């Protein structure tokens, strides 16, 4: 049962000793903006030396997988492979490739509310995008991702496509907002998806955390035993809920969005799926449970 206990000492050594692997969120866990969380690169290196598998799960849909891998390298996270990185953009591309499979002349196109990184991920999966050069096939899906150019006219166009009951509505994630370095907030994909849902009267299929579909994408590529895997994240409503839904041990790090007070409030309210099993001040604290 999740009790939001501080992970340290003997409990930390026991939890890490039993774990085969760790899933990490990225923003607010490994870095904040362009600043890495102190000790994060060293932790990943020590986990690798200890034989622990590490994978990374992000709701950020702004970067295609190769670009995300470059970001890891640029920030000083050495030795990681692109195959270890799972974003909501990648998972959306996989889902749409599955759902829109068929003859080339019948596969249809995806209308994208999102940036170039998301579009690149879709193209890499062999999907056709509405508005790309050439004759536009019928739009068979609307995909909502993080879109800094979101507008009333684009919303109207998306709703026009969604009047077709066979047109899919997919969202990369439901994160309502994201923190900025100055303490302010910027709207997240969840805010944009809510606008499309309200205007179209349709319900989006969400692929990112806390949807188990992201874990399904991971298990297609890696052998992962959720009972022996840690999910480490900074957001209770996405990372921790995702971990619970997929049967993992959950660890909240306090370097990002959610606070210990929020976790304790969920515990008091009996909303245990939003309560982590453990918390740490920073993921660097996990190094105390690893042998040198």
Curated annotation (Swiss-Prot):
Belongs to the HAD-like hydrolase superfamily. Divalent metal ions. Mg(2+) is the most effective. PANTHER family: 4-NITROPHENYLPHOSPHATASE-RELATED (PTHR19288), CHRONOPHIN (PTHR19288:SF94). It is found in: Cytoplasm, Cytosol; Cytoplasm, Cytoskeleton; Cell projection, Ruffle membrane; Cell projection, Lamellipodium membrane. The active site is at residues 25, 27. GO terms for cellular component: actin cytoskeleton; cell-cell junction; cleavage furrow; contractile ring; cytosol; glutamatergic synapse; lamellipodium membrane; midbody. It catalyses: pyridoxal 5'-phosphate + H2O = pyridoxal + phosphate; pyridoxine 5'-phosphate + H2O = pyridoxine + phosphate; pyridoxamine + phosphate = pyridoxamine 5'-phosphate + H2O; O-phospho-L-seryl-[protein] + H2O = L-seryl-[protein] + phosphate. One of its GO terms (biological process) is regulation of cytokinesis. This is Chronophin. Substrate binds at residues 58-60, 178, 209. It holds the Pfam family Hydrolase_like. Mg(2+) binds at residues 25, 27, 234. It is an enzyme of class 3 (hydrolase). Keywords: Cell membrane, Cell projection, Cytoplasm, Cytoskeleton, Hydrolase, Magnesium, Membrane, Metal-binding, Pyridoxal phosphate. Homodimer. Functions as a pyridoxal phosphate (PLP) phosphatase, which also catalyzes the dephosphorylation of pyridoxine 5'-phosphate (PNP) and pyridoxamine 5'-phosphate (PMP), with order of substrate preference PLP > PNP > PMP and therefore plays a role in vitamin B6 metabolism. Also functions as a protein serine phosphatase that specifically dephosphorylates 'Ser-3' in proteins of the actin-depolymerizing factor (ADF)/cofilin family like CFL1 and DSTN. Thereby, regulates cofilin-dependent actin cytoskeleton reorganization, being required for normal progress through mitosis and normal cytokinesis. The gene is Pdxp. Ubiquitous. highly expressed in brain (at protein level). InterPro entries: HAD-like_sf (IPR036412), HAD-SF_hydro_IIA (IPR006357), HAD_sf (IPR023214), PGP_euk (IPR006349). Its cofactor is Mg(2+). Its main location: cytoplasm. Its EC number is 3.1.3.16, 3.1.3.74. Inhibited by beryllium trifluoride. It is a peripheral membrane protein. One of its GO terms (molecular function) is phosphoprotein phosphatase activity.
């Amino acid at each position: 049962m999740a009790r939001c206990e501080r992970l340290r000492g003997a409990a930390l050594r026991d939890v890490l000793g039993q774990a085969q692997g760790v899933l990490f969120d990225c923003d607010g866990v490994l870095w904040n903006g362009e600043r890495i969380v102190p000790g994060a690169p060293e932790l990943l290196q020590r986990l690798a030396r200890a034989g622990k598998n590490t994978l990374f799960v992000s709701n950020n849909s702004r970067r295609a997988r190769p670009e995300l891998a470059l970001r890891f390298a640029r920030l000083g996270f050495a030795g990681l492979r692109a195959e270890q990185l799972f974003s909501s953009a990648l998972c959306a591309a996989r889902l749409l490739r599955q759902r829109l499979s068929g003859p080339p002349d019948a596969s249809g196109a995806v209308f994208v509310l999102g940036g170039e990184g998301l579009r690149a991920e879709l193209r890499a999966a062999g999907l056709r995008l509405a508005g790309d050069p050439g004759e536009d096939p019928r739009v068979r899906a609307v995909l909502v991702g993080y879109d800094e150019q979101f507008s009333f006219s684009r919303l109207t166009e998306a709703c026009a496509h969604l009047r077709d009951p066979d047109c899919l509505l997919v969202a990369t994630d439901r994160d309502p907002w994201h923190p900025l370095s100055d303490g302010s907030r910027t709207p997240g994909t969840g805010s944009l998806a809510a606008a499309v849902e309200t205007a179209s009267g349709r319900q989006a299929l969400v692929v990112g955390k806390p949807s188990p579909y992201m874990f399904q994408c991971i298990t297609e590529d890696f052998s992962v035993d959720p009972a022996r895997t840690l999910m480490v994240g900074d957001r209770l409503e996405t990372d921790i809920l995702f971990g619970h839904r997929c049967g993992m041990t959950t660890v909240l790090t306090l370097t990002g969005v959610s606070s210990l007070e929020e976790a304790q409030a969920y515990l008091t309210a009996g909303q245990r799926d939003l309560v982590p099993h453990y918390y740490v001040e920073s993921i660097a604290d996990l190094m105390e449970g690893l042998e040198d």
